[in-house]
């Protein structure tokens, strides 16, 4: 089994969907390793726009079987709603090519209610979650009180565990705007509907042990990783290479490619440190031209310049074999383009390839930039590297050199599926 892993290298929203969609055309199997319906990306295929959250992007390819893996958390109503939406847009038979590990955890409406209450208690220190209940669900998993997807099939066990969760949160928060019996009633219907989708992950993988091409689709990104990201302003799962290997029980020796997806600039949704953020006309222009609004929340994304310190750190953890640089065309109309090359701490220490663990330190670094000339010409839809303006090629090659020679193999030049340069 040859395994390709696609990972976000910044704070998410890098455009992982397009490269995953492209690679899935040759894949036998596409897997989601972590996260839940908090993730979001868009794929444009045959002029139809598909929004993905919990489902793997490989569903767009009619020959690709898809798995929601053991490290994920599954909001069952969202699973069925998203599947119906995809089938309604023409992806017929998608429901026969999607499976869920019985070891994945169930994200309940209860978790969404608790998510909102926890954010409200934090006040000005809130994390800026999507409000989907992902954090509380992973908290229950870590505390060994969560409900696994496979347990939905045992009605008595399922109902006992959900009522216990509800009782615990009621003791903590008081009366909740949530009806546990109503949710239990909904799962009486979901129980039978879920039967065709639930699988033993290891047994499932044995069916594909001879697959020449397995694709792993990362959700979120390295800087949102629970261990390696800008803690506590992170998601609640392991979003890097290690998380994918763990959640899907992958053989590291079978990994042939690790693709880091990076925007040609940097964005972030929600709260937390963002050293290269531009709270000025440059940030506004990046946001406007790049149409930077979250697929899941609709929130305006914060925007800033490309951050080499962040990307060197991300590469050191995820060990990328190649990069996909996305949204190059957004930079077409800039006279000059800045790249963050170092952080300077308050005591004068200069960092170039490590990221401070302390969020307070992250908030107070000063970024040292280099300024590169813009190209002031249209790159939208360009498909050959040699057709890019010289300064655009220089920008890409500068990033390659500064990241230790990791090749930028794919370059996104627009939203359409074929707006992509593939460098051999």
Swiss-Prot record:
Its main location: cytoplasm. Plays an important role in the de novo pathway and in the salvage pathway of purine nucleotide biosynthesis. Catalyzes the first committed step in the biosynthesis of AMP from IMP. Binds 1 Mg(2+) ion per subunit. One of its GO terms (biological process) is cellular response to cadmium ion. Keywords: Cytoplasm, GTP-binding, Ligase, Magnesium, Metal-binding, Nucleotide-binding, Purine biosynthesis. It is an enzyme of class 6 (ligase). GO terms for cellular component: cytoplasm. Homodimer. Mg(2+) binds at residues 13, 40. Its cofactor is Mg(2+). Belongs to the adenylosuccinate synthetase family. This is Adenylosuccinate synthetase. GTP binds at residues 12-18, 40-42, 301, 327-329, 412-414. Pfam families: Adenylsucc_synt (PF00709). InterPro entries: Adenylosuccin_syn_GTP-bd, Adenylosuccin_syn_Lys_AS, Adenylosuccinate_synth_dom1, Adenylosuccinate_synth_dom2, Adenylosuccinate_synth_dom3, Adenylosuccinate_synthetase, P-loop_NTPase. Pathway: Purine metabolism; AMP biosynthesis via de novo pathway; AMP from IMP: step 1/2. The keyword Metal-binding applies. It is found in: Cytoplasm. It comes from Aspergillus clavatus (strain ATCC 1007 / CBS 513.65 / DSM 816 / NCTC 3887 / NRRL 1 / QM 1276 / 107). It catalyses: IMP + L-aspartate + GTP = N(6)-(1,2-dicarboxyethyl)-AMP + GDP + phosphate + 2 H(+). The keyword Nucleotide-binding applies. Its EC number is 6.3.4.4. The active site is at residues 13, 41. GO terms for molecular function: adenylosuccinate synthase activity; AMP binding; GMP binding; GTP binding; magnesium ion binding. Substrate binds at residues 295-301. IMP binds at residues 13-16, 38-41, 130, 144, 220, 235, 299.
């Amino acid at each position: 089994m040859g395994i390709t892993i696609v990972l976000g290298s910044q704070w998410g929203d890098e455009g992982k969907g397009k490269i995953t969609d492209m690679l899935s055309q040759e894949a036998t199997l596409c897997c989601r390793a972590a996260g839940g319906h908090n993730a979001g990306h868009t794929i444009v295929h045959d002029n139809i726009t598909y929004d993905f959250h919990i489902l793997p992007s490989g569903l767009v390819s009619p020959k690709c079987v898809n798995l929601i893996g053991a490290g994920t958390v599954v909001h069952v109503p969202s699973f069925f709603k998203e599947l119906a939406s995809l089938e309604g847009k023409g992806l017929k038979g998608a429901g026969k090519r999607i499976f869920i590990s019985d070891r994945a955890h169930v994200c309940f409406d209860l978790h969404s209610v608790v998510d909102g209450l926890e954010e409200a208690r934090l006040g000005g220190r809130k994390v800026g979650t999507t409000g989907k209940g992902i954090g509380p669900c992973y908290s229950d998993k870590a505390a060994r009180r969560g409900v696994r997807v496979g347990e939905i099939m045992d009605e008595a066990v399922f109902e006992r565990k959900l009522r216990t969760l509800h009782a615990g949160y009621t003791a903590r928060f008081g009366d909740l705007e949530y009806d546990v019996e109503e949710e239990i009633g909904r799962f009486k219907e979901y129980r039978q509907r879920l039967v065709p989708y639930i699988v033993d992950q290891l047994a499932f993988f044995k069916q594909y042990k001879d697959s020449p091409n397995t694709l792993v689709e990362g959700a979120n990104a390295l800087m949102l990783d629970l261990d390696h990201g800008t803690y506590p302003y992170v998601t609640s799962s392991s979003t890097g290479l290690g998380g994918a290997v763990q959640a899907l029980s992958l053989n590291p020796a079978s990994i042939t490619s690790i693709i880091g997806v990076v925007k040609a600039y940097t964005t972030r949704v929600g709260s937390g440190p963002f050293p290269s953020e531009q709270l000025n006309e440059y940030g506004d222009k990046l946001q406007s031209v790049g149409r930077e609004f979250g697929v899941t929340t609709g929130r305006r994304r914060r925007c800033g310049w490309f951050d080499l310190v962040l990307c060197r750190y991300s590469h050191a953890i995820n060990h990328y074999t190649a990069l996909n640089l996305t949204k190059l065309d957004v930079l077409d109309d800039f006279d000059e383009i800045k790249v963050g090359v170092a952080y300077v701490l308050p005591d004068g220490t200069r960092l170039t390839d490590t990221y401070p663990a302390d969020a307070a330190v992250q908030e107070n670094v000063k970024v040292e930039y280099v300024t590169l000339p813009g190209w002031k010409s249209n790159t939208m839809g360009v498909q050959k590297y040699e057709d890019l303006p010289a300064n655009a090629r220089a920008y890409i090659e500068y990033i390659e050199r500064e990241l230790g020679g990791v090749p930028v193999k794919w370059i996104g030049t627009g939203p359409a599926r074929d707006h992509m340069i593939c460098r051999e």
